[in-house]
């Protein structure tokens, strides 16, 4: 099935360069820069709109989680056809919006870590509903099959579960060694949660919230207490994880959860994106200001391209 938050790629790339307050566009075939937007603040994560014509991008503000400096309060609306900033949505407070996701009804969801909440936003009216979830969420993921939103708490060994229809927290999943980046498989049945204190990714059942399996990031140096991210390919075949301080990434078979590949990266790997051919992926190396293209089956780095400083998130469209 098609996951609205994880659509097949296309001929273009859009990328956030948060340290430069920019969003950049590249040709996916040549990796040549084709456009650039000067953003109103440090822009971190993105999601495509329901009609695929726009991208919603979180304007997080300065600093990092737990050390916010001048936290922002905006979601940027970017038009893909014109490669331009259309407008911004005010989320109602300086909450440092970060992770953004769409549900099947067209609601835009965002984290509000400085309000211990998630935000439900109507993109057409800019109306915002704040839903407290009992902790500071930095990342969210949505299972359309189960009608749930999952939010990871970087400062706790927990992931909150929100019922999308009721718009309230219904459970709290205990996660070993903290919770960092999270992702849901395209079919909606598996939740992947990166650990903070170990080089591991935990696989949970989105229906029962039971821990199914723990995946080690084999080959990584294994530095504790660091940012880690995970994504599942749009076709559901691969799970990718990055380990920020280790400068390392790994690829797993999504069916067997066996590690297929692991490879060293340039400094500070962060967000993944997936190419149109379903055989390659992209990985933003934040501190190096370089994005890698690699083969999913082998982890072999095939190409790379330079970006503005602080590349964090990339989408192929």
Predicted regions and their residues:
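Predominantly soluble domains enriched in secretory-pathway, periplasmic, or organellar proteins
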Residues: 1-317
């Amino acid at each position: 099935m098609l996951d609205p938050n994880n659509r097949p790629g296309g001929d273009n790339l859009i990328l956030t360069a948060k340290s430069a307050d920019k969003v950049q566009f590249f040709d996916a075939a040549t990796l040549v820069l084709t456009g650039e937007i000067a953003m109103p603040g440090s822009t971190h994560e993105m999601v495509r709109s329901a009609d695929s014509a726009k991208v919603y991008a979180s304007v997080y503000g300065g600093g990092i989680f737990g050390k916010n400096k001048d936290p922002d309060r905006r979601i940027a609306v970017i038009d893909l056809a014109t490669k331009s900033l259309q407008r911004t949505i005010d989320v109602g407070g300086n909450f440092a919006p970060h992770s953004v996701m769409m549900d099947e009804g067209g609601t835009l969801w965002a984290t509000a870590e400085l309000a211990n909440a998630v935000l439900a936003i109507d993109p057409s009216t800019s109306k915002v509903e704040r839903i407290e979830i009992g902790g500071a969420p930095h990342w969210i993921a949505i299972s359309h099959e189960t009608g749930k939103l999952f939010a990871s708490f970087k400062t706790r060994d927990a992931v909150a579960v929100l019922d999308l229809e009721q718009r309230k927290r219904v459970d709290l999943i205990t996660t070993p060694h903290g919770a960092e980046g999270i992702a849901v498989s395209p079919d909606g049945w598996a939740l992947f949660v990166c650990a903070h204190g170990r080089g591991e990714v935990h696989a949970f059942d989105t229906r029962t919230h039971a821990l199914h399996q723990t995946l080690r990031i084999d080959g990584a140096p294994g530095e504790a207490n660091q940012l880690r991210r995970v994504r599942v390919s749009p076709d559901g075949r691969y799970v990718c994880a990055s380990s920020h301080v280790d400068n390392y990434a790994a690829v797993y078979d999504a069916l067997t959860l066996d590690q297929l590949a692991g490879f060293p990266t340039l400094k500070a790997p962060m967000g993944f994106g997936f190419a149109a051919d379903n055989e390659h992926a992209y990985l933003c190396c934040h501190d190096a200001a370089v994005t890698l293209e690699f083969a999913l089956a082998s982890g072999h780095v095939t190409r790379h391209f330079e970006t503005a400083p602080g590349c964090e998130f990339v989408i192929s469209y």
